[in-house]
Amino acid sequence: MAKKVVGEIKLQIAATKANPSPPVGPALGQQGVNIMEFCKAFNERTKDMAGFNIPVVITVYADKSFTFITKQPPATDLIKKAAGISKGTDNPLKNKVGKLTRAQVLEIVDKKIADLNTKDRDQAAKIIAGSARSMGVEIVD
């Protein structure tokens, strides 16, 4: 028989930087989860993704055990790293802050496609390109 799910927690935590302080501690403490056990497991699983914020979905069961799924970093983080910028622009129509090549967009798509709402690579490229444009990053061939 399957375990009874009592809660689902969605967080974005810096890779390898999970610790009992907010937002992790209070979110897990409310559900009665062993916070240090989660922090150690999360840090171990994300050790090769340092420098990114990692979305994580934690499923909590009635016996206070948990499982968690880590996703790929947000598309905006991948775009900022590929374009070499620290943040997007406040006015993407007038101010361009960086450039991405088509190849860089496809590289981001390959990392991110599992988390997108399409399985078609061309559609995924359009989604990533749209995110880049809204940040003021130009797509060049």
Swiss-Prot record:
GO MF annotation list: large ribosomal subunit rRNA binding; structural constituent of ribosome
* Record GO cellular component, one term: cytosolic large ribosomal subunit
Instruction: Tell me yes or no: is Ribonucleoprotein among this UniProt entry's keywords.
Output: yes
Q: Where is the signal peptide?
A: none
The biological processes this protein is annotated with in GO are: translation
CDD domains for this protein: Ribosomal_L11 (cd00349)
The answer on whether this UniProt entry bears the keyword RNA-binding reads yes
Listed Pfam families: Ribosomal_L11, Ribosomal_L11_N
Q: Keywords for this entry?
A: Methylation, Ribonucleoprotein, Ribosomal protein, RNA-binding, rRNA-binding
Superkingdom is Bacteria
Post-translational events: One or more lysine residues are methylated.
What does this gene product do? Forms part of the ribosomal stalk which helps the ribosome interact with GTP-bound translation factors.
Assembly description: Part of the ribosomal stalk of the 50S ribosomal subunit. Interacts with L10 and the large rRNA to form the base of the stalk. L10 forms an elongated spine to which L12 dimers bind in a sequential fashion forming a multimeric L10(L12)X complex.
- Name of the featured protein: Large ribosomal subunit protein uL11
What organism is recorded for this protein? Answer: Campylobacter jejuni subsp. jejuni serotype O:2 (strain ATCC 700819 / NCTC 11168)
